[in-house]
Amino acid sequence: MALLIITTILWAFSFSFYGEYLAGHVDSYFAVLVRVGLAALVFLPFLRTRGNSLKTVGLYMLVGAMQLGVMYMLSFRAYLYLTVSELLLFTVLTPLYITLIYDIMSKRRLRWGYAFSALLAVIGAGIIRYDQVTDHFWTGLLLVQLSNITFAIGMVGYKRLMETRPMPQHNAFAWFYLGAFLVAVIAWFLLGNAQKMPQTTLQWGILVFLGVVASGIG
């Protein structure tokens, strides 16, 4: 329980730190690259290939690329359109997406009640901002929901892999973050803006915190 509380606090700070000091000032793709790159370095000593097939390693990397690489890219872009509090509010749909995607991947009967709940939540988001709804708002909302969905796909994929192709969790996380790092490198070279690099010690410090502490240790 203590570890869960500590992790929750670290993640709570990470949202505010990025929104206050990095969003709009530092290129979001570079921020993702540094965050997952540093986290990958934390887990690098646990990287093992022995006993794992190339397909298994590739699947763990693919899941990591989706859950962390693509998810961070989408959520970091969303900060340009939403406030930190709005972004946090709109992440409440993630458990619903996890349930729905798990049903689909498990070939179970889809629980439409959860799908309807997700739809109501989106409508509710519009009502909350009914007097200030703009194209920017809807763009941000869409980015957060896509981020939620990619995170949910990764969560379900990881659970399925641990059931069908198990490996020690610290080893799995090493491949996980390596996959996220590779997709972040590609995104940075294709879409990144080299003119918006960190300019202050504080910005670099926050990136180190996000990568080593929030993602690596947390």
Model-derived regions: residue spans:
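Glycine-/small-residue-enriched transmembrane alpha-helix faces in small-molecule transporters
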Residues: 1-30, 133-160, 182-186
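Specific transmembrane alpha-helical segments of multi-pass solute transporters/efflux pumps
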Residues: 10, 14-15, 44-91, 127, ...
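Membrane-interface helix termini and inter-helical loops of multi-pass transporters
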Residues: 16-28, 80, 126-139, 164, ...
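Structural signature of hydrophobic alpha-helical transmembrane segments
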Residues: 20-38, 76-94, 139-150, 202-212
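Hydrophobic/aromatic residues within transmembrane alpha-helices
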Residues: 21, 31, 78, 104-106, ...
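Transmembrane alpha-helices of multi-pass small-molecule transport proteins
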Residues: 24-70, 97-98, 150-157, 174-191
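C-terminal transmembrane-helix exit sites in multi-pass transporters
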Residues: 42-51, 75, 94-116
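Hydrophobic transmembrane alpha-helices of multi-pass small-molecule transport proteins
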Residues: 43, 110-130, 148, 184-185
